[in-house]
Every structure is written in C-alpha cells, then in structure tokens.
C-alpha cells in the first residue's frame, strides 16, 4: 500500500498497518468527541480515495492540542455553556479562551446567595445595608445578574429573612434617612461564613472578598473568575441556599396546614354516662367526658378554656340547677331527689326505669338490706359531692317553694280585695 494521498504537503506520514485501522475507526465513531474534535484540529484533513477502509484521519492535531481533555465533562452531551470554547452567542472560538468581560457577563458566579449577601455587607463602611444596596452591589460586581431573571432578588430576600446568619438592625445604628430595614451579619455565625468562604478553590478571590481594611479596597474591581475555577466550582454544594429553600417550603406548608385545620370543623362526641337506677343516682357522679373520633379523652384546663367547669361537682351543680329550674319532666326532678325523700313508709323504693340492669338491682337489694360498704377515698369524695348536690337541691327547692308561696299570697290578697270590692259595690247599690 502506497503513501496516503490528500495529506498536507509539509507532513509526510506513512500509513499505519491494517492492525491499527480498527482502533482508528473506533476513535472516529466516538459519540462524545465529534464537536470537540472538529473545534480543536485546525490542520486535520480526510483521506478520500473511494474506499471505506482507506479513509484515514491525520492525527497530528492530537499532539498540537494539549487542553483537549480539560474541555470534557463526564455525563454531559456536547460542550457545556460555560466551556471556554463557547462565546456569548454560543459559537465556537478557535482560540479556546474568553475575555474576562465575556466570561463575567455569561457565567453565573459560583457563590451562594448567603455568601454574596455576606460579601456585600462586609464591603459596606457601616457593616449594614438595606436590601436595595445589596442588589446594587451584586449587580455592580457580577454583571450576570443584570440579564438573569428577576427571581434572584426573591432568593436574596428569602435568605435575609429566613437565614440565621443575618439579622435586622435598628435604624438609629445605621442610616438615619431612607426607608426599609437594615441588615447585618450575626456575629455568632460570622466565623461559619468566613469558613465557607475559605473553602472556595480560588485564593485570589478570597483575598479580594475578605473585609476591606481601607476605603480604596472597597471601590476596587473584583477578581474575574476564570473558566477553570468555574468548572471546579460546579460541584460546590450551596448549603445555605438549600437550608433557606427548605425553611421556606416548611413555612408555606405549615401555614397551609393551619389554614386547613381552621377551616375544617372538628366534631366532638359527647359521651353521656349510662342511665342508672334512681337508688344509685348519687353514688357515682362521674363528670361528662368529651371524646374525639380517635377515642382519646381531652383534659381541658379550666384556666385556658372557661366554657367548662373546673370540677365534676360544679358540673353536677349546674346540671341539677338547670334540671330543677326547668322542670321539663317528672323523671329529671325525681332523679335528683335524695334517697331518703323517695322511700316510702314501708322502706320500698319508687318506680324504676326500664333500662336498669341486673347490677343496679343488686345494688338496690344491698341498699335495702342495710349493707354498709367500707369507706374509701373515692366513697368519701362521692359522699361530699352528694352532700353538696343535695344542699344545692334543697336550696333550689326552698327558693321554688318560697316563690310559690309568694304567688299564693299575692293570689289570696287579690281574692280578698276583689271580695271586699264586690261587697262594697253591693252595699252602694242597696
């Protein structure tokens, strides 16, 4: 096989043997290299003599281009937008580098918003800035944000309000005139911000963004990041931004849940005590228990909620007063009359409800036989409650009887007055 035709006249390379052809064809068919190969080989030419097995590529460009592998990134298709092979319009630049103006305008700074806010505040003479001045500082130092969507301003505000690194300052400590709040760095969390800034892979940017020692350093132009430092910064995790975003999401979700809980009514099931026999009406006085759907008993503090009574005795008193004063039915009145007043001369009880159980009848028979149980703490407490309830009932009955007697007296007086008036009228007629 003769020398390959179509080569450049100043390069004479013998054609490789047939064993090297498969390796060259694999290099030619690689899917992740075509655009980079076409951009970085200025002297490459193709061999075209009509046969597919004789089409060989000049490989001199591999020795001339030394920065080829630096432009590749694993897991990406083609060339990334921040690659030095691209300019602002996206065209391939043959020089393989960019000017600082093009880089600063097209690339996003590798700092988190908390670090940007920290640097802006530290560059101020009073170490405190309003939100508008923070915006202007970021726009002056990083022209990328002048063409970026306006959502970055919301991120700055969220970091100021939700991040623990920053706090509001009283207006007297900073600017006297103007509107809006002043923000400064919390001294407690300032070392952590400095440590996060030291983790940046470029030392020159660190030297520039440390707090200034003179007013001249405040007005100095910031360091423009190179493409290599930007590629190193791609894998940097912005912890503070993630924390601020998660805090904002949690805040929104908690507000929505509270609004839904307020709108949704919570039904409470009132569990009334089981109806007992009239003999044991005052033996057990359990207070009414309010239960939710899950069956748990709600313990309500009387100091917090004034709609509920503080003890079971008070609830029994309220219940007894309402039932006696209303006089809705004979059973309700009879249920609150003491046992001694309900027993007859022969010691027999009055009528019983149809819902009484066998246990209630057993308790009644024990009470008729004169069996006295041993006193305990619960019995003493129940006896106190019964005494108080009976005293209240007696007072209510006395008041009702007095009112009835008063009405009866008024009636008798009216009757007597009418009789005397009729008698006098009869006398006058005669």
Swiss-Prot record:
Keywords: DNA-binding, Nucleus, Transcription, Transcription regulation. Expressed in the developing eye from stage 23. Localized to the prospective retinal layer and a layer of cells lateral to the ventricular zone. At stage 29, expression extends to the branchial arches and the brain. At stage 33/34, expressed in the vagal ganglion. At stage 36, expression in the retina decreases. Not expressed in the eye lens. One of its GO terms (biological process) is regulation of DNA-templated transcription. PROSITE patterns: FORK_HEAD_1, FORK_HEAD_2, FORK_HEAD_3. Gene3D superfamilies: Winged helix-like DNA-binding domain superfamily/Winged helix DNA-binding domain. It is found in: Nucleus. It holds the Pfam family Forkhead. GO terms for cellular component: nucleus. This is Forkhead box protein N2. It comes from Xenopus laevis. The gene is foxn2.
